[in-house]
């Protein structure tokens, strides 16, 4: 049974190549274009890992990360923040809120897939 990866970003130009990359590596994918949509998708599909942008409409990625970590039913979900917000303060905040990893844009496909594999052991 393939592992599920939820890709959360408001830019289709980011989502499409990430979705292709994940599927080429054997992962089932889901997509959300906002933090609000991400929360709904997480509650329905319970992904194994979330690739999460920070700058999202309505509910930002930091808040999504925090909400996931506050729900004990979702303790097993791994979170990678994948964002252009690469300042040390943002990295520290993301990790403090419970993200498992923080990758800054622009990123390499090999960097992303290596981190995904590391976190969900596939």
Locations of the language-model features?
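Hydrophobic residue at a beta-alpha junction
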Residues: 32-33, 58-59, 68, 85
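The feature encodes the CheY-like receiver
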Residues: 15, 57, 75, 87, ...
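Acidic, metal-coordinating helix/loop segments flanking the phosphotransfer/catalytic sites
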Residues: 31-49
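C-terminal output helix
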Residues: 107-116
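Two-component/phosphorelay signaling modules centered on CheY-like receiver
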Residues: 12-30, 119
